[in-house]
Amino acid sequence: MAQEKRDVEINSIQDSLDMLTPEIRPWPVTPPPSAEEVSTQVYTKRKAEDFLGWVEDNVKFEKSFGKAEALAGLKVLDIGLWRLGHKFAASMLAEAGAEVVCIEPPGGDPLRQLTPFGREEYMLADQETGEKCGIEFIAEMVNQYAITLDVDTEEGQQVFRELAANADVVIEALPPGYADERGIGYRHLKDLNPGLIYAWTGIRGQWGPDKDRLSKHGQWEIEPFACASNAWIHSTGYPQDQLPRGKGGDPTRAGVWIADYVAGEQVAVNIMAALYWREEFSGEGQFIEVTGAEALMDITDFDMTWYGFNKSIKARTGAWDPNLNQYEWNPCKDGYMMIGGQSDRLWYRIGMCIERDYPQFGRLIHEDPYLKEMGARNALHALIKTYTLTTRWLRDINRVQAEEALLEYEIAAGPVLFVDEVCEFPHFKYRPWIYNCESDYGTFLYPTSPNAYQFDTPHRLKWVGRRLGKDNGEIYSKWVGYGPTRLAELKTEGVI
Amino acid sequence: MCDVIWCKKEVDGSPCETVNYLDPFCFWNWEGTINCAECRTVYYIHMIQGHMYKGPEERPGEEPDTSPLYADKPLEGYRNYMFATEGRTRPFECMPRSFLLGEADMVKFSIRGKPVRGWRPQPESAGIAGSFPYHWDIQNLSPDVWEEYQEKIRKGEVSDW
Amino acid sequence: MSKKKDPRVTRIEDLAGPKSPGELEEMKMPYEEYCRQAFDPGNEAKKPESLKGIRWLSCTMYIFTPHSAANLAELGAEVIKIEIPRMGDAMRHTSPFNEAYLYPLHESRPMTGTGLGFTNANINELYLTMDYHIPEMVDVFYGLVKMSDGLTELYRPGTLDKWKMSYKYLQEINPRFIYVWGGGFGYGPKVFGGSYDILGQAHAGLASITGMHEYMGGHATKCTNWVIDWASGTIITYGVLAAIHWRRKTGLGTMLEVSQVQTPTRFMGYSVPLYGRFGIVRQRWGNWDTQLCAHGIILCGKSDYPDADNPQEKFDARYVMVSAFNDPDFQELCSVIGRKDLWDNYPRHKQRLEAEAQIEVYDALEQWAADKTRTEVSDALNNAGILAYNVKNHREVYESEHLRQRGTIRWLDDPLFGDLLTHCTYSTGLMSKSPRRLKWQWRPVGADNVKIYRDMLGIPVSQVEDWYEKAWI
């Protein structure tokens, strides 16, 4: 395709904005390899073309839309503001086929207004109405219907009860006791709908001496509060011995609101378990509570068990893992390179690979009697020595060279990729792990659900976020039988 | 010589032959003076993107800005200097305790004083084909530890938390 | 929709409020008390298990795939972990700085322990050993498949297929079977690339947006723990439970192909769509937030425990999470730290969210905190009604009354290994009627060989012993 060329002078972001569209700067920049190429150039190398051909025939992403949906018919209500945990759980259920309705107050979830560094130019406009919305909100509302309801009004509470009487699942992410005070909490709804599975999710809990708080002015706690309260931040980041404190050598939060995602997926798992128990055994719903602080604590490896063993407080170790050698990333010529291989078989193979270019590595590492035993290699001084010499090799080569060299030795190795590189990585484009969907807000590049590759019931993305209240008509009609006149009344009263 | 300083300084008529490891995140971009862990010779180095742009140049008489974290001597069976060896290597503060063992910690009791199977060797207790029961018969298998536990209870060294 | 009422009749169910003395008590109860009673931490064992009767095979190693099966075991499924004879899961040989092990690893290895790296990834499971390579084992394996609901495996592509143990074969034996192949990359050009948690963090972009910005002196930072391994494992569990739900209707199993490296990209919020639309490549932003200000972690001048022996307390009890992004909160914050000029300069959220403004705001906060301890800072802010929270360490987590009351930190009297502090299972979520529970942490390699080979599959003990001698099991 011929590309038009023109000269552009860029003095501010404004000068480049109209060029930053997918039409002018398409994704992907280069096409992924074809199935034919992958089969003949990759799969045949290890005589796996038959098996992988069979896998591709059956689980390929492109075939997912013709298949059944695992949770078809499941009705889910999601109510909450500000955070991503409940939204991620709701998205997971919706990706598997549930009918998920997201309830916002008539003013909308404040998350709709959030945009990186306050840049309104990075918000997207609804193609019908032009209403602007932040990208994070759109991204975390997969396959969900958007309706409005003010549960602070008595009428709104009644409407909520009617919706919930019809639902299989309610996901709630309001401050502790907020729904209960309004007569729409679990203890009220369970009588209306004994089969209802009701899941609350938040930061530290809706009960207990350190439960979730609001500020004096009503501001919510948002991630990373959860990560601060379970020692996760305490042990993330570079030690002050590697980088000066205040200049990179500090406890560090994740770049994303990670506890929200971790809690969200456990909300979805617990809901599915409760659903199985309801359908298989009891016919009864139940009450679930998942917090970011605790769900993330669940997956902090052995940390607390180690404290109970000999009062160890896990220290941060930067990009090095204290349990395995090698298992780290270190700087290289054009970024950072991750290398992993702990067992003797893999560890010596890494050495053989590096030795080819840098013979001294083999001498200093493989001859050292203190590095011969797998467990002993995890001692701190062994990490310092191994990684210093590994980096001595890496500094002369870039990520792609390191990856190619190490893959030749069947070592798990990978570059630290930036977002553009992630989106252009051939493997990711091939599956595809990211792809463009045509949304209400125009072309929207999206990471695929990891459960999208299945024989029979792959999870899938059908649409992303919608404008505020877009589905009021459809959902109120289907779920509770309200017609246009009734909706108009509710709108006038400010209930929806 | 980069990323490591292989010190060849003549000391008492023979070269020092100590490898000082310059850990990558600290020294990736760095300028200053550093001592050899063995002979304490001070070197000036200027590292840019992991490459030694200048140095190592000897700076006799100067105090070093820093020290390596670890150094060893390949010609002497890899005799080594661990971190935090005073005057030779840099301390490493960011640790889970004030000391590291680097080898298995033999633990018989948890921090609240109850028995935990954290020591070796354990007496044989398996059945057929490596099967184990669902019960640690500590009284019979490790009566000494059980006795020690009773003693701890008597002394009030066992608590709920 | 509420049913049409007969206006002449007053039925008790139509009246608002409780319908019996018991319900009256329940409705009068303060909400916190109600929650506490509903979840009743510590009494999980007295309640039914959600996944009673499900049996799952865990042909797994490391953290990612084991966790996907352990989630099922926590919820009441019977999970059989199949390991390499004598050696077991590679994860058993990992321990922080080589220091913490529980003994023994295996009957024949009294001097080798299982490292704490194995913790939490395989709880409540039965431990079987089997060498799949041995032709005699294939039929035994098929026996397990016929008696089970599904399997999770992580072998290199085609490995189990070579031994006729892939879904291609197993669906013939058991059409209800649900098969999970959890790999690093899955089909595609990098299908043979191995993977680890840290590789996922690096490769999928999470590392590129975590850590201090270059101008702050930082590098791409690894999220602590094997967080992506665990989180991807839970994604599998969810896929499995959805498939089980579908199977209840259709009687048919399925195969899932799940890639661990993909998960972190899905966790990155606006990053990918922002790139797709505008070509903007999200960068690291350290301890601050790209969408809220003030909402970040600050360094205080003094430690809370300057005399502590443990360096983690002595040097690092210095960080506070501070959050005041709404206008009134930010105004209050500026007044507490004596910098009303900041409020005058940045009265709108959009203004204080600009990068330059953030730098100014957090600098001002750290200057104000320079002569204070962590707790002095958080107390001063909390007393003013602003949200602030100490960045806690593991001792503080252990001593948290909140987590103790909720049962999410508790001691386990492990049947085989004794007294273990535990932070898993209960912490994944409280459930009022069919909660998760922790029965045991792990068992030695092959600890349930007789229980499964003889008691379940009916193989004579002499045969089992013979296989054991040959190291087939």
Provide a role label for each language-model segment.
Chain C
Residues 2-252, 450-473:
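N-terminal helix-loop segment corresponding to the beta1-alpha1 unit
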Residues 43, 302-303, 313-318, 374-375, ...:
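An anion-binding loop in the catalytic cleft
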Residues 86, 184-186, 260-265, 302-304, ...:
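Glycine-rich beta-alpha junction loops
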Residues 109-111, 118, 282-290, 296-297, ...:
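Short Gly/Pro-enriched turn/cap motifs at secondary-structure boundaries
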Residues 220-231, 255, 286, 293-295, ...:
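A short glycine-threonine-serine/GTX helix/turn-capping micro-motif
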Residues 243-286, 394:
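Substrate-binding/catalytic subdomain of NAD(P)-dependent oxidoreductase enzymes
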Residues 294-384, 388:
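Aromatic-enriched alpha-helical interface/lid elements that frame and gate functional surfaces
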Residues 384-439:
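A glycine-rich dinucleotide-binding beta-alpha-beta segment and adjacent secondary-structure elements
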